């Protein structure tokens, strides 16, 4: 999070002005932007987010996710911005075996990424008590899919998430490695909870409205509540792109099961994921790939 993009939204337009401000060297520029556009709320989506990279370079993750978030919070508070929504992660949870993760489940991150996000959650809880700022942390599970109505020219495409990697592998007629197929899951492969990016966007708006009307701090799981295995993803991609070559590789030291209990978000935020079935997620990802690679949709 070396810089922050500020986008001002109005009902009469899709998006208003966009500003690129360097953090922390030019954080004073936030004062002018906040005052000029009378900003009273912030949805904070920036940060570093790779689990593997976080263990190799934890300093970067604590700087971007903790130190710079604190700098941003302090500036917002100084300018009387009293509503803050933070993108946290399911990586804050401990290994929960085959059980759903509830907000009350043990938080014991196994990587620096999760630890950095959990640290910010603690900060938000303390800040909401000490200062006039209401905070919500949204614990994202596996965000996937695309807004196929967006203009791909303005968005970078990098296949670094599982579904995108499988689609890219299929188009290249390469072989996809499945790391482990003897886990105690329905088909032996890792299971994750995939939630469509458009449902996540809706959750942020719901959280923002909640923040404006409720004092203090809250956290919510944002997932689909649907367990999907790696093999099921491969099968779904094959429905669009045909047979994918696979091979089984040794299991890696990773969490093999992650699933959200989203009861709290449903009841308190009145949020329900509408686009997060795996067929809709994969279909949007295939279409996005074809849009960005100038190929017809299969």
Where are these regions (language model features)?
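Glycine-rich NAD(P)-binding loop of the Rossmann-fold in SDR/ketoreductase-type enzymes
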Residues: 41, 60-68, 107, 115-116
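Short-chain dehydrogenase/reductase
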Residues: 62, 110-118, 152-164, 193-194, ...
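N-terminal Rossmann/SDR dinucleotide-binding element
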Residues: 1-41, 158
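Conserved Rossmann-fold NAD(P)-dependent oxidoreductase catalytic core, especially the SDR/UDP-sugar
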Residues: 44, 70-112, 130, 136
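C-terminal substrate-binding subdomain of Rossmann-fold SDR/epimerase-dehydratase oxidoreductases
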Residues: 170-298
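NAD(P)H-binding glycine-rich loop region in Rossmannoid oxidoreductase-like domains
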Residues: 27-64, 98
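Active-site segment of SDR-like NAD(P)-dependent oxidoreductases
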Residues: 48-52, 90-99, 107, 141-144, ...
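Active-site Tyr-X1-5-Lys
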Residues: 95, 108-146, 164-172
């Amino acid at each position: 999070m070396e810089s922050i993009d500020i986008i001002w939204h109005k009902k009469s337009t899709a998006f208003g002005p966009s500003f690129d401000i360097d953090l922390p060297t030019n954080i004073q520029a936030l004062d002018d932007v906040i005052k000029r556009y009378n900003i009273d709320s912030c949805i904070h989506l920036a940060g570093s987010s790779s689990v593997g990279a976080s263990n190799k370079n934890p300093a970067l993750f604590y700087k971007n996710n903790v130190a710079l978030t604190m700098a941003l919070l302090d500036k917002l508070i100084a300018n009387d911005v009293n509503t803050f929504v933070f993108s946290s992660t399911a990586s804050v949870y401990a290994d929960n075996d085959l059980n759903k993760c509830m907000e009350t489940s043990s938080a014991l991150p196994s990587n620096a990424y999760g630890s950095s996000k959990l640290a910010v959650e603690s900060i938000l809880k303390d800040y909401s008590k000490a200062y006039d700022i209401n905070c919500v942390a949204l614990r994202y599970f596996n965000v996937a899919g695309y807004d196929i109505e967006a203009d791909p020219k303005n968005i970078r495409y990098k296949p670094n998430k599982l579904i995108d990697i499988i689609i890219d592998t299929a188009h290249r007629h390469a072989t996809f490695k499945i790391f482990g197929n003897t886990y105690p899951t329905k088909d032996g492969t890792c299971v994750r909870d995939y939630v469509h990016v458009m449902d996540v966007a809706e959750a942020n708006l719901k959280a923002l409205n909640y923040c404006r009307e409720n004092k203090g701090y809250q956290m919510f799981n944002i997932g689909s509540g649907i367990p999907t295995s790696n093999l099921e993803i491969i099968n779904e991609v094959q429905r669009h792109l045909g047979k994918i070559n696979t091979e089984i590789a040794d299991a890696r030291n990773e969490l093999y099961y992650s699933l959200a209990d989203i009861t709290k978000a449903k009841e308190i935020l009145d949020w329900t994921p509408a686009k997060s079935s795996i067929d809709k997620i994969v279909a949007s990802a295939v279409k996005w790939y074809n849009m960005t690679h100038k190929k017809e949709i299969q």
